Amino acid sequence: MSDLTKKDDEYWRDKLDAEQFRICREKGTERPFTGEYCDSKEPGTYLCRCCAEPLFESATKYDSGSGWPSFFQPIKGDAVGEIKDTSHGMVRVEVVCHNCGCHLGHVFPDGPKPTGLRYCINSASIQLQKEGAE
């Protein structure tokens, strides 16, 4: 992880709007079917909202019916970190940006082939870099 993991709340509040801060830095969750990228089919690369690290390719995005953008694998194996999450009386696996620690969402073992995984990601935690844009 980079030095971004050591930044304080004030640093992130200056960079993110209130909803993005709640989700990315306080491990919040956006309401299902409300996120900007829930239904997006635009080609490109999804970057971390906090640090612009590439996380997911649109080619791995699919409609899981969950109400959140879902991907079957990250752009590379070490793009995201996984942390055991026992909040809210459940046992889940939290997904974070490996570069800055941004809360992205959770990963579940009910996704499609080839991985069988569903990375259920908050739209507020990512931003789409459209294909051909830099």
Swiss-Prot record:
It catalyses: L-methionyl-[protein] + [thioredoxin]-disulfide + H2O = L-methionyl-(R)-S-oxide-[protein] + [thioredoxin]-dithiol. InterPro entries: Met_Sox_Rdtase_MsrB, Met_Sox_Rdtase_MsrB_dom, Mss4-like_sf. Zn(2+) binds at C48, C51, C97, C100. GO terms for cellular component: cytoplasm. SUPFAM superfamilies: Mss4-like (SSF51316). Its cofactor is Zn(2+). Residues 9-131 form the MsrB domain. One of its GO terms (molecular function) is peptide-methionine (R)-S-oxide reductase activity. It comes from the Bacteria. It is an enzyme of class 1 (oxidoreductase). Signal peptide: none annotated. Gene3D superfamilies: Peptide methionine sulfoxide reductase. Pfam families: SelR (PF01641). Binds 1 zinc ion per subunit. The zinc ion is important for the structural integrity of the protein. Its EC number is 1.8.4.12. Keywords: Metal-binding, Oxidoreductase, Zinc. One of its GO terms (biological process) is protein repair. The active site is at C120. NCBIfam families: peptide-methionine (R)-S-oxide reductase MsrB. Belongs to the MsrB Met sulfoxide reductase family. This is Peptide methionine sulfoxide reductase MsrB. It comes from Saccharophagus degradans (strain 2-40 / ATCC 43961 / DSM 17024). The lineage of its organism: Bacteria, Pseudomonadati, Pseudomonadota, Gammaproteobacteria, Cellvibrionales.
